[in-house]
Amino acid sequence: GITVFVVGHINKDGNIAGPKVLEHMVDCVLYFEGDPNTSYRLLRAAKNRFGSTNEIGVFEMLDDGLAEVPNPSQMLLEGRPEGASGTCVACVMEGTRPVLAEVQALVTKTTFNVPRRAADGFDFNRAVLLMAVTEKRAGMKLNLLDAYINVIGGLRLDEPGADLPVVLAVASSYRDVPIADDLAAIGEVGLTGEIRAVSHLNQRLACLLYTSPSPRDPKT
């Protein structure tokens, strides 16, 4: 056979630049991402003609090369602080795989005329909506405070089941009351403040039985 190398260009956003001809030529487009300060790397599929693009692979760079991380949830919760306010564990679906991730929130007094909102690893507009629901339904005066949301480990939570962990993390930081270390939250939050069930609940619960969210009780 003949091996052909096709050279493309990646723009500043990390996407394939120019016309989509290069993406149309191939069956699969994979992104290998990770924080340069850690040894962990995430493998994501932006295009996959033979399967889901929601699946992720987690790898660790060792002395003898890359090795698969068999339990990504344990890796993503590694180093989680005990008894800290503003943190909650979420159980989300990455394709067909349930994964535990830590959601952190910081609510603090603003120094600006208009309070700041920021979200890393979570949709910004969804975060603003959930904060509005929290303020209206729970009576928290977030309109006078800065609020920041961060998902640890480089994951991006873009499913309804991550709503409740975000709301709980924000409320925990606002009240400065820690959430129980062994508690994980799953649920969609509506505009009236109700909590709705999400899909694949049995799989998520099985993941929680396999990997404890508590840093004091790491199951393997």
Label each PLM-derived region with a short phrase:
Residues 3-81:
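Phosphate-binding/switch region of NTP-binding enzymes
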Residues 54-207:
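Conserved P-loop NTPase/AAA+ ATPase motor core
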Residues 210-215:
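Conserved small/polar residues in nucleotide/adenosyl-binding loops
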